Amino acid sequence: MEIFVWCLMPSHLHMVIRVQGYKPELIIGRFKEFTSKNIQLAVKQNPHESRKDWLVSMFEKAALESSNVKNGKFWQAGNHPIELWSPDVISQKVEYIHMNPVEAGLVFEAHYWKYSSAIDYSGGRVVLDIDYL
C-alpha cells in the first residue's frame, strides 16, 4: 500500500492510497482491524490515560451494537473508498483532506495540524513516510 495523503481527525480518518493486487475495501478492513486492536490495547494498558474507563466502555458499547465485533469496537462500520480518476479530482481531494482541520476550526492553516500529511507537502517535518503525488 502506498500512502500519498492522510489526515487523522478527532472522529475520522482520510487517506489517499494506492493498492495493487488487492481490493481497497479489503486493505481498509485489515487496516481498521489492526489499528482497532492496537489502539484499544494502548488505551487499556496506559496507566496515565485519565479517560480509560470511559473509552473502554464506549468501545464495548459500540461492539454490542455490532453483529461482527466481539471485544470492543473503535472504527465505524463500513468504509468509503472512491477511485480518483483524474489529476483535477486528485487535486480537489488532496485540498479537501488537508483543509479538514482548518474547516473544523482546529487550526488556522493546514500545515499546523500535527496529524496530517499537509506538513509534508509544505516542506516541514515528516510524521509518516508518504509517497508524494
Q: Where are the regions that the model predicts?
A:
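Short catalytic/metal-binding and nucleic-acid-binding patches
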Residues: M1-L133
